[in-house]
């Protein structure tokens, strides 16, 4: 385990931008010429605390240049609303999309920041009528707000959850359909997707996403890869992560390099077959 001065980052992620996008990605910046594969997703795709996250490992295994467009706070909206990034995906040989939660996107009940999708902006009149006793100005983040609403009323919250699930499927399908070329979906978590009729793990990412929602997208994708990391795999990779002392709680939430190597192996085989 590598520690640096208290509060200082232990890795230089060489932040960079692509095209006209305002989002910051992990660098160094890659050339967008010739054959390459694009990767969309959240903090695991970005590879926080990892010297070599799975997009880079895929490049090593396949010889195909990887363009890592993973973003720490991005949900579906950040990509769907960014024409520049969609154009980059359309120029690639394939696009891998790590599935992100259904909570970090705008919907009938609330709006999120267009780039930092974890940021709650405002409640709609539907939500304020449903929860007429809640002061929504108290919330800055979607997860905090949803946790509070769920604690107040399970019956009311079921309406919110169903809206998020429905909106996620529609938004994901729109994202896939706006990408020219092959799309591979990646489930990456410390648990399997819950089956229809089961209660999804309430506080685990990707939040509210179940197997039925993923299956609703399979007709529009080239492949779906499922990686459910075991506690042993996560623990085995902990010593190879790089972070400062202040980042320990956040680092403990990450899946780690052993899991990323398994993801890369599966993706490399799939991409070789598709291309």
Predicted segments with their positions:
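A broad, low-specificity signal for short, low-complexity segments enriched in glycine/proline
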Residues: 1-4, 55-60, 142-149
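Alpha-helical cap/lid subdomain in secreted, periplasmic
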Residues: 87-275
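Helix-enriched interaction subdomains in cytosolic or periplasmic regions
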Residues: 1-13
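Serine-esterase "nucleophile elbow" of acetyl-processing enzymes
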Residues: 14-73, 78-88
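Short, hydrophobic/glycine-enriched beta-strand segments
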Residues: 1, 37-41, 98
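Membrane-targeting and insertion segments and their boundary/processing signals
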Residues: 10-11, 25-28, 32, 36, ...
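Alpha-helical structural elements
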Residues: 8-9, 20, 126, 238
């Amino acid at each position: 385990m590598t520690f640096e001065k208290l509060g200082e980052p232990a890795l230089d992620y060489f932040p960079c931008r692509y095209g006209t996008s305002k989002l910051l990605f992990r660098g160094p910046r890659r050339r967008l010429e010739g054959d390459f594969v694009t990767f969309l997703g959240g903090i695991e795709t970005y590879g926080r605390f990892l010297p070599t996250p799975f997009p880079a490992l895929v490049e090593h295994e396949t010889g195909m240049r990887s363009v890592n467009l993973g973003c720490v706070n991005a949900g579906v909206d950040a990509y769907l609303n960014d024409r520049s990034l969609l154009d980059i995906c359309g120029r690639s040989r394939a696009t891998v999309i790590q599935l992100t939660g259904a909570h970090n996107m705008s919907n009938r009940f609330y709006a999120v920041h267009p780039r930092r999708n974890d940021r709650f902006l405002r409640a709609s009149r539907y939500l304020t009528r449903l929860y007429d006793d809640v002061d929504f100005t108290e919330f800055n983040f979607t997860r905090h707000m949803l946790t509070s609403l769920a604690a107040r009323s399970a019956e009311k919250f079921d309406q919110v959850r169903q809206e998020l699930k429905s909106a996620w499927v529609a938004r994901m399908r729109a994202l896939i359909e706006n990408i020219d070329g092959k799309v591979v979906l990646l489930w990456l978590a410390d648990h399997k997707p819950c089956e229809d009729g089961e209660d999804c793990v309430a506080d685990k990412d990707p939040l509210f996403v179940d197997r039925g929602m993923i299956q609703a997208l399979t007709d529009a994708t080239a492949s779906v890869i499922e990686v459910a990391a075991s506690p042993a795999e996560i623990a085995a990779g902990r010593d190879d992560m790089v972070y400062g002392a202040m980042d320990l709680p956040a680092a403990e939430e990450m899946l780690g390099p052993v899991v990323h190597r398994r993801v890369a192996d599966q993706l490399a085989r799939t991409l070789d077959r598709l291309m």
